Structure formats: structure tokens, C-alpha cells
């Protein structure tokens, strides 16, 4: 098995810790909030409020299931527009009350179904990109599995973007890339090599700011590592002025 094949499989592994696992383990007294106040609740996006060392934080994540029944509830981690609108509602609420935002990203992409398109999938993603770029609070985004296309970026316009070591981040799946370029989806891992989708490759290109190592760590050790990184980073970002937060976020993404 090649290194890229192993990383892609690890990123997609159904046994990986989910957004909800991290939210409950890292943040004290995590309380979920539901619904976009327009259509319905989307099980693919979780969000709520928790406490990190006494600091209130808004936590949002894209949630995959751990078995078939759970995956059906979570739509296999592919959000509908109401999921992105729920996320935006919680982010605007965080801004209103001065809470920093932490997002956990794990999706192959936004759901491409007819109903999702009819309800404005593209608009929901675009609005999140626009609104996140101007939020007046610190934002940290962590890719914990797959970071697929605009569906991931809709929660990823942050002051700091981190990746777990065995996660991937790309404009589309390796299978999609291979199908478009070579009309042969079986060449997916060859495509993945060309796409430069791994954490260390993206760190080298300055697409992400930090790689959180996983090798040799238990789940609890990984949770502890992320919690410590968040404590340090939020302490630093919280000392910035609103103008510094917004300008740094803008410049971070403009440089691409």
C-alpha cells in the first residue's frame, strides 16, 4: 500500500473521531443547538456552545456517521443548504456575544441532490464564505478527515486552518479528478499524488497553518493535544483587535 493510499483510507475511516466526539471531549458542558430557522435541522452539521478552560466557545462541525443507520441520519457527512445556514446562524450568534468559533470539518463535499440545489446550495455556501470573511471574532478551522471542495471551505474561512496528520483537503475527490482527467476513476490514487492533498504537502504550500500529528497517539492523547493547541491559539487570537482579526483572515485567503 502506498503512503497516499494509506492516508486517504485513514481520512475516510468510519472509526475516526467525529466532530461530535471532539466537541464533547474538548469542550466542557457542550450543548447542541439545532435548526436553521428557515427549513429544518440538518443532521450532517452539528453545532452548539461549550466552554474551553472557562472561555465560552461556539463549536460547529460536519458530522459523519459511525454505522449505516447513523450515516443515513447524517447524510454521510454531506450537508444540505439548511446545514450551512444553521452553521451561519450559530456563527452570527457567536459574533453577537463575542464568542470565538471552532469548526471541525469532515466531508466529501456538499450534498449535490436536486432538493439541495432547489433550496439554494450554491447560495448557502457562497454566503458562508462571504459572512465568515467578515466575522468580528476569532475562527479556527480543523480538518479532521476529508476536506472536500466548497462543502468544506464553507466552514473553513478562518484565521487559523489546521489539519490532522491523516486528513486530506482538496477541490474534489481523487476519484472525481481521475474521472474528469482520464475518464478512469480507478486511477484515483495516482490522481491523489498529483493533487497534493495531504496535510504536510498543504502545510508546505501554506494552505494550512498547522499539522496535528496522529501517529502513535491514542484517541485521548489526540484530544488532549488538540485541546492544548486550541488553548494557546485562542489566547493569542483573543488579544487581537477586531480589525486585526478581519484583516488577517482576508489577507490569508487573498494570497492564494
UniProtKB/Swiss-Prot annotation:
Keyword Hydrolase: no
One Gene Ontology term, aspect cellular component: acetyl-CoA carboxylase complex
Record field: transmembrane: none
Enzyme Commission identifier(s): 2.1.3.15
Pathway(s) annotated for this protein in UniProt: Lipid metabolism; malonyl-CoA biosynthesis; malonyl-CoA from acetyl-CoA: step 1/1
GO molecular function terms listed in the Swiss-Prot or TrEMBL record: acetyl-CoA carboxylase activity; ATP binding; carboxyl- or carbamoyltransferase activity
Presence of the UniProt keyword Zinc-finger in the record: no
Residues of the CoA carboxyltransferase C-terminal domain: 1-236
PANTHER family hit by this protein: ACETYL-COENZYME A CARBOXYLASE CARBOXYL TRANSFERASE SUBUNIT ALPHA, ACETYL-COENZYME A CARBOXYLASE CARBOXYL TRANSFERASE SUBUNIT ALPHA, CHLOROPLASTIC
Function: Component of the acetyl coenzyme A carboxylase (ACC) complex. First, biotin carboxylase catalyzes the carboxylation of biotin on its carrier protein (BCCP) and then the CO(2) group is transferred by the carboxyltransferase to acetyl-CoA to form malonyl-CoA.
Protein name: Acetyl-coenzyme A carboxylase carboxyl transferase subunit alpha
Species annotation: Streptococcus gordonii (strain Challis / ATCC 35105 / BCRC 15272 / CH1 / DL1 / V288)
Amino acid at each position: 500500500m502506498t503512503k497516499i493510499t494509506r492516508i486517504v483510507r485513514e481520512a475516510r475511516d468510519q472509526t475516526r473521531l467525529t466532530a461530535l466526539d471532539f466537541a464533547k471531549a474538548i469542550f466542557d458542558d457542550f450543548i447542541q443547538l439545532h435548526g436553521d430557522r428557515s427549513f429544518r435541522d440538518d443532521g450532517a452539521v452539528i453545532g452548539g456552545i461549550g466552554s474551553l478552560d472557562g472561555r465560552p466557545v461556539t463549536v460547529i462541525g460536519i458530522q459523519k456517521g459511525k454505522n449505516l443507520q447513523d450515516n443515513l441520519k447524517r447524510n454521510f457527512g454531506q450537508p444540505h443548504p439548511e446545514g450551512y445556514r444553521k452553521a451561519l446562524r450559530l456563527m452570527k450568534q457567536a459574533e453577537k456575544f463575542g464568542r470565538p468559533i471552532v469548526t471541525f470539518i469532515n466531508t466529501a463535499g456538499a450534498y449535490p441532490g436536486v432538493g439541495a440545489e432547489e433550496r439554494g446550495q450554491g447560495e448557502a455556501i457562497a454566503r458562508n464564505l462571504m459572512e465568515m470573511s467578515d466575522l468580528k471574532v476569532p475562527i479556527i478551522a480543523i480538518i479532521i478527515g476529508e476536506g472536500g471542495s466548497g462543502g468544506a471551505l464553507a466552514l473553513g474561512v478562518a484565521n487559523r486552518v489546521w489539519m490532522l496528520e491523516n486528513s486530506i483537503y482538496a477541490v474534489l475527490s481523487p476519484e472525481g479528478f481521475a474521472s474528469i482527467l482520464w475518464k478512469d476513476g480507478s486511477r484515483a490514487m495516482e490522481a491523489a499524488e498529483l493533487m497534493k492533498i495531504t496535510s504536510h504537502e498543504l502545510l508546505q504550500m501554506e494552505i494550512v497553518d498547522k499539522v496535528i500529528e496522529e501517529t502513535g497517539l491514542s484517541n485521548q492523547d489526540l484530544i488532549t493535544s488538540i485541546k492544548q493547541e486550541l488553548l494557546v491559539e485562542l489566547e493569542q487570537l483573543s488579544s487581537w483587535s477586531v480589525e486585526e482579526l478581519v484583516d488577517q483572515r482576508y489577507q490569508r485567503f487573498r494570497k492564494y
